[in-house]
Amino acid sequence: MKLGSSVPLRRRGFLATLGSLTAFSIINGTAPTALAELRKGRLKQGLCLSVFSGTKLDMEGKCREAARLGAYGIDLVGPKDFPVLKKYGLVPTMVPGGSGIQSGINDKKNHAEMGAKMEQSIKDAAAAGAPNVIALAGDRKGISDEEGLDNTVLFLNNIKKPAEDQNVTVCLELLNSKVDHPGYMCDHTTWGVEVCKRVNSPRIKLLYDIYHMQIMEGDIVRTVKKNIQYIGHFHTAGNPGRHQFDDTQEMNYAGICKGIADTGYQGCLSHEYSPSKDKDPLETLDAMMRICEV
């Protein structure tokens, strides 16, 4: 497949950003391979490395399979992995930002250290043509939701200018506090949306994790349509179990993806499930991506 107009802009942009390194890459054996066709449908589909659980693939093997299956990119990879993603025409769709699930940006004492890490992550993402950096609120640990909201807004207000200047979106992740992450503060869409409203920047949005918000709220499609302007990225997994979203779980992902696509959403939907041990990981990934071709 030739690198032409049929290759989506972000994928072409990622390769163009690193184009000055082409000669060096060829010499060192990391030049881009021929790009596989992306998945059909209106949504760009990405992956988290958890989908390869149960395989013995190294990073290059994972990138090779991701490209073969028509993925747009891979989430939560840092600069050391950018060259191998580039080799297979994959975008680093979400870059780690330096905050943590338990210790995050809702606590002022973390702001100096995490702010420096976040600024570096934004620079790394911009240099690679990566669209997003992840942020995590952190656990409550005695902090009220209102104080935590104020602290989170303060942090993101301090980071929004470098994000805006470098065209990178900082995505605050919504997680469930009921099953997987007891105490996590950013556990409801309304709280996350309020953060985004107060910061008021096109480069501060939410990472809407469908699995987590199904546990906390349900009503996924209506919630997404109401708040799509504040959503910069999606994660998928089946519930219960956080495995593949087949007929062993409760959500209709074809319907959910259609609802997302109907909003005109232009970002990425990345699969973050872990395949059941009785399933072939690569066959499962192919099947899950087919479900989301809407």
Which residue stretches match the model-derived regions?
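Active-site-proximal loop/turn and secondary-structure-junction residues that shape catalytic pockets
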Residues: 51-53, 78-80, 98-100, 139-141, ...
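Histidine-acidic metal/acid-base catalytic patches
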Residues: 2-61, 65-67, 129-131, 186-208, ...
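Short acidic, glycine/proline-enriched helix-loop-strand junctions
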Residues: 83-95, 168
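Active-site acidic/histidine proton-transfer and metal-coordination neighborhood
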Residues: 18-26, 104-205, 215
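Anion (oxyanion) recognition and catalysis
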Residues: 67, 86, 126, 164, ...
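Catalytic domains of carbohydrate-active enzymes, especially glycoside hydrolases
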Residues: 62-81
